[in-house]
């Protein structure tokens, strides 16, 4: 066994800011933070619904707060950004072939957004 110390290159905590690819990756992964807030709000709302009309009205008042509305808009934007990056990655990771030919990437991405729009419309009509 050697007594030599292995070379360990020092890295700053902000090393990723110097590389556009990693900066984009970190922004994409950071979109989870507003979604965590949104999920917690929904869970608290579910608990308020179980507790009764007074708790439900209190939760509705909380959700009507302009800061909460702004955070929910940020969560929606983050969710759409995350979906866009996922949808644009999908044809590269799993190319779809029909009749021996690979479908155009734009067709696959547009089909995914069409499915999102159709499901959203269906949920809005049902609820």
Curated annotation (Swiss-Prot):
A single GO molecular function term of this UniProt record: succinate dehydrogenase activity
GO cellular component: fumarate reductase complex; plasma membrane
Residues passing through the membrane, by range: 30-50, 67-87, 107-127
Location in or out of the cell: Cell inner membrane
InterPro entries, sorted: Fumarate_red_C, SQR/QFR_C/D
NCBIfam families in the cross-refs: PRK04987.1
Family affiliation: Belongs to the FrdC family.
Name of the protein this chain belongs to: Fumarate reductase subunit C
């Amino acid at each position: 066994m050697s007594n030599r110390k292995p070379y360990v290159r020092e890295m700053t905590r902000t090393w990723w800011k110097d590389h556009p690819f990693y900066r984009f990756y970190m922004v994409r992964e950071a979109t989870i933070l507003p979604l965590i807030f949104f999920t917690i709000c929904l869970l608290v709302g579910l608990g308020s619904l179980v507790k009764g009309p007074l708790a439900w009205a209190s939760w509705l008042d909380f959700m009507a707060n302009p800061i909460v509305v702004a955070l929910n808009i940020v969560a929606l934007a983050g969710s759409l950004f995350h979906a866009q990056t996922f949808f644009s990655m999908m044809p590269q990771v799993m190319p779809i072939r029909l009749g021996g030919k690979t479908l155009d990437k734009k067709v696959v991405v547009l089909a995914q957004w069409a499915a999102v729009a159709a499901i959203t419309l269906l949920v809005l009509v049902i609820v």
